[in-house]
Design a protein with these regions (language model features):
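Active-site-proximal beta-strand elements of phosphoester/diester hydrolases
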Residues: 1-13, 105-115, 144-147, 198-204, ...
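N-terminal active-site segment of His-dependent metallophosphoesterases
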Residues: 1-61
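Divalent metal-coordination and catalytic microenvironments
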Residues: 3, 8, 44, 49, ...
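Acidic/histidine-rich helix-loop elements
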Residues: 7-27, 52-54, 86-92, 117-125, ...
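Catalytic metal-binding/acid-base residues of hydrolase active sites
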Residues: 10, 50-51, 84-85, 114, ...
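His/acidic metal-ligating clusters that form di-metal
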Residues: 31-43, 120-201, 228, 238, ...
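Extended active-site neighborhood of metal-dependent phosphoesterases/phosphodiesterases
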Residues: 55-137, 169-175, 196, 216, ...
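His/Asp/Glu-enriched short active-site or ligand-binding loop at hydrolase and phosphoryl-transfer sites
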Residues: 203-213
Length: 273
């Protein structure tokens, strides 16, 4: 199975610019154009933070760009919720927030790790029980789980304060199942790692790129967009290629936060103390 994995599009329902700088719709168009010639795509997976303003119009813009792109290739478009997404508007345009997609002899399961009014992630007992029930029966070539907040620790200081709450609860459900891969976003930079032997793939952001080279008390983002091309063979480990969608403005500063700015956001949108 070949997957084009896109995340953190942060679209608007109007012509607003992200941080007053980034045209996120144009960035998504660049990403799709960069993937234009890839053969054999089976799925286009978007792993959350699809909208910035939570408007129905923003989700329609996303659907109207991605669905035809996927359809032209005989691929399936699959969408997951992120912390910026609005549950009702998402569901109205894109369908259920948690879902099982059968892809031939594979299966893709989307989860909703969003917490209303917050930026950290969480999966409640009911959702984990549902996932465990779905995974109780395996499929021939295994399952891919899509969840916005990665079940692995962040690299940058702000995102370490906005991680998935209790990732071990999710990993415990995945243990011993047929899950072969987890696709995530949220961190706005590419990351590939293993948790309990399961590959975790975090896609680059579309709206901007987190700078992982900053000092400990600095969070910085720059203009830059890309996606992950994920090949999941019938057996063995996935192969992940990271692809940039270049623009003339790549590398321009989007925002920079010092320690006070980081902790202000964490107090407002992080886990309750």
């Amino acid at each position: 199975m070949r997957i084009v994995h896109i995340s953190d599009t942060h679209l608007y329902g109007d012509d607003s610019l992200h941080y007053g700088i980034v045209d996120t719709t144009a960035a998504l168009r660049r990403v799709l154009a960069a993937a234009e010639e890839i053969p054999g795509v089976d799925a286009v997976v978007l792993s959350g933070d699809l909208s910035e303003d939570g408007s129905v119009a923003s989700y329609r813009t996303l659907r109207d760009l991605v669905d035809p792109w996927a359809c032209e290739r005989g691929a399936q478009a699959i969408y997951a919720m992120g912390n910026h997404d609005h549950p009702d508007a998402f569901a109205e345009v894109l369908g259920p927030r948690t879902r099982v997609h059968t892809m031939g002899r594979h299966r893709i399961v989307t989860l909703d790790s969003s917490v209303p009014g917050a930026a950290y992630g969480s999966l409640d007992a009911a959702q984990l029980a549902w996932l465990q029930s779905e995974l109780s029966e395996s499929v021939d070539l295994g399952t891919v789980v899509v969840v916005h907040h990665p079940p692995t620790h962040a690299v940058t200081p702000l995102l370490r304060l906005l991680e998935l709450d209790d990732p071990h609860a999710l990993l415990g459900v995945l243990d011993g199942s047929d899950v072969r891969l987890v696709l995530s976003g949220h961190y706005h930079h590419p990351l590939v790692t293993l948790e309990r032997g399961i590959p975790i793939v975090v896609a680059p952001g579309v709206t901007n790129t987190s700078d992982v080279t900053t000092p400990e008390n600095v969070e910085r983002a720059r203009i830059g967009a890309g996606f992950a091309l994920v090949d999941l063979p019938a057996s063995g480990a996935p192969r992940v290629s990271l692809v940039r969608a270049p623009s003339e403005r790549d590398g321009e500063l989007v925002f920079e936060l010092d320690a006070d700015g980081i902790h202000d956001i964490a107090r407002s949108f992080g886990r309750p103390e």
